[in-house]
Amino acid sequence: MKFLLVAINAKYIHSNLGIYSLKAYAEKELRKKKKAALAGTGKLLSGVAEAGVQGAEWASDGAVVTETQSVAGMSSGQVQVEIAEYTINHQMDQILQDIYRRKPDVIGFSCYIWNIQYIRPFLKDIPKVLPDVKIWMGGPEVYYRAESFLKEEPTVTGVMVGEGEATLAELAEVYGEAEDIDIRLEQVRGIVFRKTSGGILHTPVRPLLPMDEIPFSYNNLEGMEHRIIYYESSRGCPYSCSYCLSSIDKTVRFRSLDLVMKELDYFLERKVPQVKFVD
């Protein structure tokens, strides 16, 4: 199961902090699920040994798997999250070809004022070449009008509303299991999605994450040598500018100062030429 997070930036030197943050958090949660599943397998092995269970099957790596064992937790390790960044100066055919080559099962588009009109044609073209792909949208250009956007774009499966880190991690788990997807999507907070029956469902608002729970987005700087790195030490805004979406929610959260200093040191040690705060 492959998730492809797509950003279409205004310039090559720009990067999309949002999708890097989503990827980092999703991978952290998937590792936790896999670790918990492996721990559960260890307990199962211990129980099998103590009880002398007959008829157990041995997997290729030597682990015992019984017919009744649930492998739900193990499948999280099979979910792959990739990032694809393009610019509005790319030819649309180039982008479509690259997305097709990556063969994603689920695509997530990061939508802003500078790319939403550029993205819309892909919502019609991608299903023509990848008919089974699920398309999800996120970002300020879609989540405040999620239901109307779904009505305008019938190929889109759903919209992530608000901050997407925890939401994407849960979506990855749902699609990784590939069972009772509609029922399980109803349990994912912070989405508006199109049910298989055609109806549109809003799930409850997702609580905001503490900033320190969001992992550092740049543990790998490969490919970032000539690009601007964006960094946030806080989210939210206390002001009420009428033209700005940030004024809708006046909640302000901060990353701990020690963590901010540690992460900025990481950039300095690697001689990153430019870091921009997006607070």
Give the ranges of each region predicted by the language model:
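Generic structural signal for well-ordered alpha-helices
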Residues: 23, 120-123, 229, 264
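Glycine-rich beta-alpha loop elements in corrinoid/cobalamin-binding modules
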Residues: 18, 25-27, 43, 47, ...
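Radical SAM [4Fe-4S] cluster-binding motif and immediate context
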Residues: 60, 212-279
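Short, glycine/serine-rich, charged loops/turns that create anion-binding
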Residues: 10, 142, 248
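Short N-terminal binding/cap micro-motifs at the start of the first secondary-structure element
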Residues: 12-19
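Nucleotide-activated donor-dependent transferases that construct or modify glycoconjugates
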Residues: 2-11
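A short, sequence-level motif marking secondary-structure junctions
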Residues: 52, 205-211
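A short, Lys/Arg-enriched amphipathic alpha-helix followed by its capping loop at the start of a domain
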Residues: 25-35
